[in-house]
Amino acid sequence: MAVGKNKRLSKGKKGIKKRTVDPFSRKDEYSVKAPSTFQIRDVGKTLVNRTSGLKNANDSLKGRIFEVSLADLQNDEDHAFRKVKLRVDEIQGKNCLTNFHGLDFTTDKLRSLVRKWQSLIEANVTVKTTDDYLLRLFAIAFTKRRPNQIKKTTYARSSQIRAIRKKMTEIMQREAASCTLSQLTTKLIPEVIGREIEKATQGIYPLQNVHIRKVKLLKAPKFDLGALLNLHGESTTDDKGHKVEREFKEQVLESV
């Protein structure tokens, strides 16, 4: 009989369970803070792997984008169809300080606006704010019946659509180029630009459901920590004590 290994004896026991490590035990929880332009500052929590070796938790968090309903940020259900994108720019302790990154409409809201017997007019413009953020704004509008109109349809002529689109572009350019990103955000929340377009185009053709349906951030300037802290209602300046001047008294030695 040949001397060798007994394969049956060398085999390990079947069914031995591997030790499972809970992946959440290696993670930390951070709070996400919205800018002070919104009423509700606490957006929620986010998880990240703890700092270990060369992998820093702060680096993993920076640049994360969160999509939040504007209804939650403003505590108002009327804004439920709009979504705001917030980008993490800085970490302070266990807080993620975010900045505005974009705005969008929910799909169901956009679908509900499109109806028969009316013209849909869209316009977009690329504009730079005073604090050097390059944005692209998309506007949408629909024609409506004139007072005492009997005709069922409200189709605008091509020349009227061109004139309305020109007005929309001019107003968006003017409103966005004359303010900072945070000031533009305060205009977008109550839909100031949409009402301005509706008022300006009244003489061409009456409009309804005029909205800035999308705001896209194309390019951001060099990161400024001071500007971000001001946006979150915090300050970079530390309160330092004043130097107290005292009269110099020469020490007299009693014994040499």
From Swiss-Prot:
Keywords: Acetylation, Cytoplasm, Ribonucleoprotein, Ribosomal protein
GO-annotated biological processes: translation
Keyword Ribosomal protein: yes
PROSITE patterns, alphabetized: RIBOSOMAL_S3AE
SMART domains, A to Z: Ribosomal_S3Ae
Modified residues (N-acetylalanine): 2
Biased composition (Basic residues): 1-18
Listed GO CC annotations: cytosolic small ribosomal subunit
GO MF annotation list: structural constituent of ribosome
Localization of this protein: Cytoplasm
Region (Disordered): 1-20
Protein name: Small ribosomal subunit protein eS1
Organism: Aspergillus oryzae (strain ATCC 42149 / RIB 40) (Yellow koji mold)
